[in-house]
């Protein structure tokens, strides 16, 4: 395992659930911004190495805390919303991104995971294709009756930019096809060769025009010209590697389908190879990496795909990535520089995050002057359990440090050279008070992060909460971004979300008017007021996410919205669950104390009596509400406690209630598939499944509109019980819930 992977896993292991949730939120925001810069603006502010390692840390935390995975998780994001200036095209099948492998050990893990999912033994032949990952711009070409009718960029995966006129100017893209299916969407990568890129930049320089930073930027900028004649003048190329909607199968295998595309006239990468083991895949990866500089175009890794298309169908998709493919990325780069200072930033949840200020250094073609230091343990050279990292070397101001382009919120400091440490340097003393409001900053047991206790009196937290409220996945108010929110807060115009909806009332007329602020006018002020009024009607999952409740990301917000469907129902259950949440806290504390006492006394811990005692006086309605909350698939005790804590804090609850009064319509979630026998039903799988794995069963049930829960309750409709079902099967019988065998379930969904 590589050093960056080890560090990422060590950091993830040291996180408490609260700290992990906070970190995932930070990563999600930074990567969302990077996606917009990369896909929509053709002006990336992170290199591929930065971006990939950002996602690597996110993946490590998600692996350690799978229940905390967010709806806006970087591993679930595809591209960015289409830019203004182009009409939009909706993809009939989403253009997905790929999961990443960053280390050689990830590849056999990927293969083993697929074998487990498909219930394939080690002896079963399992071919993969391995092809270079082109560093360009993804494009989808739609052909109907052999004619090119449209071309669209990836966009956000669901909707892309209509670049049909520009695509027609690319020589590698056929205008007509012979003997093609009636409907065929061909997907691939628009790119520019090294030679063509150099020649283009020479012409740009001679004309006094802007030159491009790299071939990828040149290709993306050229394809996304509003004037197709400019695109025609640029030497763009296209490799086909996949397909979307197709009216007739291209082949039975990935490799066969690529050959079909080649026969139809598309350029297929000739370094694509079929491999029969992880060892073959890694050998081909090494071969391509060795030849990388001589290929004549940029690549940033190798893509592995299951060759058998029936297996691809069975494996299916995650939210934004296929289970049957992975991109094995080339390693990032390192550089050494001097740590000039350590600054402390305060986040939305009060987390104190140390940031290294560095002597600027070029790492992989990008100048880096800031890097993350994660938390106080990382600076001290230890993990959250006290174990050493970096061989226990601490980090001090003045040190010579190694910067890894891991793309945290910023790149990260990976190592320190003690031989070059200046004399008389002092160990860094992490602050125990908030640098913004001077409130005490405490570190709770089990938490890797120190947090400001100031709450809403802390300006840093208040501003970050407001920024979160207007973020893209929350209320997403047109014309009201982070910059405007911060300015309004600093001037005393807004202090909480409800104030946003009173801006027109307070600053539309009178002495202090929005239209008279610098940078504003009559038209822009009116547009903002209208945009705010438009968001008085909001989807329930967006409202829940916008509140910025700790541990409640987009995934949890969507799960809660689907389960409760109305704000009133959610609020009532959370309120009713308050005594149970307190009992849960008491039980956790009691169990921890009992474990410690048992260890000190050399005896076996007696945990259940401690839990029973803590829960003894809890009212039954509170227990039922708690079971309702924690029984939602993906919503555990950590999220439930966080919800209750927020709702029980008088100031927070009053702020939420004021917001609710400003809203006119809270929309229930859109219904999932309704044309199946199990749509809308809550299903629990228990025991051993023989025809499919648990993951496959869950994915197929959800695809048919069912809701899969991890626990049996009165709201459960069906329990699918295999051998060894145990207590869940018994509870289903006691509650009179329909029990099905695996065969009966498959018969019910029409897949026996």
From Swiss-Prot:
The protein's name in its UniProt record: DNA ligase
Catalytic activity: NAD(+) + (deoxyribonucleotide)n-3'-hydroxyl + 5'-phospho-(deoxyribonucleotide)m = (deoxyribonucleotide)n+m + AMP + beta-nicotinamide D-nucleotide
Function according to Swiss-Prot or TrEMBL: DNA ligase that catalyzes the formation of phosphodiester linkages between 5'-phosphoryl and 3'-hydroxyl groups in double-stranded DNA using NAD as a coenzyme and as the energy source for the reaction. It is essential for DNA replication and repair of damaged DNA.
Binding residue positions for NAD(+): 48-52, 97-98, 131, 154, 189, 305, 329
Taxonomy of the source species: Bacteria, Pseudomonadati, Pseudomonadota, Alphaproteobacteria, Rhodobacterales
Record domain BRCT: where: 673-752
UniProt cross-references to InterPro entries, sorted A to Z: BRCT_dom (IPR001357), BRCT_dom_sf (IPR036420), DisA/LigA_HHH (IPR041663), DNA_ligase (IPR001679), DNA_ligase_AS (IPR018239), DNA_ligase_CS (IPR033136), DNAligase_adenylation (IPR013839), DNAligase_N (IPR013840)
Residue positions of the active site: 133
Pfam families: BRCT, DNA_ligase_aden, DNA_ligase_OB, DNA_ligase_ZBD, HHH_2
Organism of this sequence: Jannaschia sp. (strain CCS1)
């Amino acid at each position: 395992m590589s050093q960056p992977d080890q560090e990422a896993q060590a950091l993830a292991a040291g996180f408490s659930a609260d700290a992990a949730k906070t970190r995932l939120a930070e990563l999600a925001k930074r990567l969302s911004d990077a996606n917009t810069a990369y896909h929509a603006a053709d002006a990336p502010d992170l290199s591929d190495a930065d971006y990939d390692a950002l996602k690597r840390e996110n993946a490590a935390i998600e692996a350690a805390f799978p229940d905390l995975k967010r709806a806006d998780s970087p591993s679930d994001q595809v591209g960015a919303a289409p830019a203004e200036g182009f009409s939009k095209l909706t993809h009939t099948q989403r253009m997905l991104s790929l999961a990443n492998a960053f280390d050689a050990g990830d590849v056999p893990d990927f293969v083993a995971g697929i074998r487990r999912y498909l219930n394939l033994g080690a002896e079963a032949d399992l071919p993969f294709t391995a092809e270079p990952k082109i560093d360009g711009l993804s494009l989808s070409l739609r052909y109907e009756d052999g004619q090119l009718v449209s071309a669209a960029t990836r966009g956000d995966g669901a909707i892309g930019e209509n670049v049909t006129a520009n695509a027609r100017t690319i020589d590698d893209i056929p205008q007509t096809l012979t003997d093609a299916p009636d409907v065929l969407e061909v997907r691939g990568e628009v790119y520019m060769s090294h030679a063509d890129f150099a020649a283009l930049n020479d012409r740009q320089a001679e004309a006094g025009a802007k030159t491009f930073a790299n071939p990828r930027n040149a290709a993306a900028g050229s394809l996304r010209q509003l004037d197709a004649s400019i695109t025609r003048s640029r030497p763009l190329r296209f490799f086909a590697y996949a397909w979307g909607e197709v009216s007739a199968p291209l082949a039975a295998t990935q490799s066969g389908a690529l050959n079909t595309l080649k026969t139809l006239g598309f350029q297929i990468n000739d370094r694509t190879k079929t491999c029969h083991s992880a060892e073959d895949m890694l050998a081909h990866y090494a071969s391509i990496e060795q030849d990388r500089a001589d290929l004549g175009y940029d690549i940033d890794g190798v893509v592995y795909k299951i060759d058998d298309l029936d297996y691809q169908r069975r494996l299916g998709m995650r939210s934004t990535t296929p289970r049957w493919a992975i991109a094995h990325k080339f390693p990032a780069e390192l550089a050494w520089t001097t740590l000039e200072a350590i600054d402390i930033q305060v986040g939305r949840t009060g987390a104190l995050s140390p940031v290294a200020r560095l002597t600027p250094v070029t790492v992989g073609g990008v100048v880096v002057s800031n890097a993350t230091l994660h938390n106080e343990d990382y600076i001290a050279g230890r993990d959250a359990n006290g174990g050493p990292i970096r061989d226990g070397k601490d980090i001090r101001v003045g040190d010579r440090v190694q910067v890894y382009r891991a793309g945290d919120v910023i790149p990260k400091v990976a190592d320190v050279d003690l031989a070059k440490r200046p004399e008389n340097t002092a160990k860094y003393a992490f602050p125990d008070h908030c640098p913004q409001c001077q409130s005490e900053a405490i570190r709770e047991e089990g938490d890797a992060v120190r947090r400001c206790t100031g709450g809403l009196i802390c300006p840093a937290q208040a501003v970050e909460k407001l920024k979160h409220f207007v973020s893209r996945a929350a209320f997403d108010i047109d014309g009201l971004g982070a910059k405007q929110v911060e300015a309004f807060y600093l001037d005393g115009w807004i202090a909480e979300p409800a104030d946003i909806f009173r801006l027109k009332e307070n600053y539309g007329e009178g002495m202090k008017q929005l239209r008279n602020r610098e940078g504003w006018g009559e038209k822009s002020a009116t547009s903002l007021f209208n945009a705010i009024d438009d968001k008085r009607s909001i989807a329930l999952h967006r409202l829940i996410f916008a509140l910025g409740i700790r541990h409640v990301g987009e995934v949890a917000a969507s799960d809660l919205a689907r389960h409760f469907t109305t704000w009133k129902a959610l609020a009532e259950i959370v309120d009713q669950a308050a005594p149970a949440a307190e009992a849960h806290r008491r039980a956790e504390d009691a169990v921890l104390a009992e474990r410690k006492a048992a260890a000190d006394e050399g005896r076996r811990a007696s945990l259940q009596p401690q839990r029973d005692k803590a829960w003894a006086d809890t009212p039954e309605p509170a227990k039922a509400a708690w079971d309702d909350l924690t029984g939602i698939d993906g919503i555990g005790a950590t999220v439930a406690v966080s919800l209750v804590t927020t709702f029980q804090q008088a100031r927070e609850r009053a702020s939420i209630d004021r917001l609710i009064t400003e809203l006119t319509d809270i929309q229930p979630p859109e219904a999932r598939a309704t044309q199946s026998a199990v749509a809308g039903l809550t299903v629990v799988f228990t025991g051993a499944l023989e025809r499919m794995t648990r993951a496959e069963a869950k994915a197929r049930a959800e695809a048919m509109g069912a809701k899969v829960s991890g626990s049996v309750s009165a709201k459960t409709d069906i329990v699918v019980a295999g051998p060894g079902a145990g207590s869940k099967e018994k509870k289903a019988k006691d509650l009179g819930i329909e029990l099905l065998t695996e065969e009966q379930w498959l018969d019910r969904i029409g897949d026996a």
